[in-house]
Every structure is written in C-alpha cells, then in structure tokens.
C-alpha cells in the first residue's frame, strides 16, 4: 500500500514495523492515530530513525476532525490499508469502520484487529460481554450492510503447516474492498 493507517498507537511498535516495511519497499507512508499519545511514546517515535515515514495524529479516531486530518495526508489514487487497533468495543469499531471505509482502495483491506476477544470472554481478566462486544462482531455487522466489502482472510502463500484453519488473534477481521 501507499498509505497504512492505524488507529491505536500505544508504544508505537507496529507503526515502526510498518515504517520499516515502507522503507524496504522504497515508498509508502504510515499514519498513526490515538486518542492520547503518551509524551514519552511520542518522543520515542519521533526520535526513531524511521520517524520520517510516520505521521502521528492525536484525537478521537472516529471524529470527523481527525478523519479529515487523515484524509489530508492521502493523495488521490493512493492505495490505502487501514488497521483498527484502538478501542475494541463493538460500538467503537463500527464507528471507525464507518469513518474509514471510504479510504480503503479496491482490493485492499480495512482490518478490525483482536476479534479473538469473543473466544476469551470467560478467561481470567476477560469480560462476559466480550462474547458479543468485540471487533469481529463489528466487522461481521459492517460487512452485512456494506456489500462493497467482504470478510476474506488473506491466503497463506508460504505455509508449510498442516493446519487447515488460520490460527489468529484477528478472526473475521479482514474486510476486503471488492
């Protein structure tokens, strides 16, 4: 992709990883959005050798103001991949899906990460509502009302495993724009 957008910055590790991929490919841009970027994390990201590949935006990821700021960094015709990894409640992920789906290029994805929560609702430190209140439920609901997106796990092109199903923290996460 030309642009990788990720909601949820935390320590910035995935932003740095994506920036490294962009550098290796010789092109691309990473936009990281968070409601509150901790000052020490911002300093570390901005001091990193890959910082020039990253734009940080602070604010509510689903707000019109933040979405408009993100759009200002995307040129027309750019291939865009969106990863939603901030607040994992179903309601918030649905708001992000609605806010960002228009930026996703045909053939690319918007990914609602950490849907595995639904399978962890009954473990220590889990929450009973995770069974229905999770990113996978949001992605499935979104796909039902947006026929231009299909839930489609990317193929495993180099798997030597005998597994027949993907082992993932991101079930029902990959929404491909058709």
Where are the regions a protein language model picked out?
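S-adenosylmethionine/decaboxylated-SAM
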Residues: 1-178
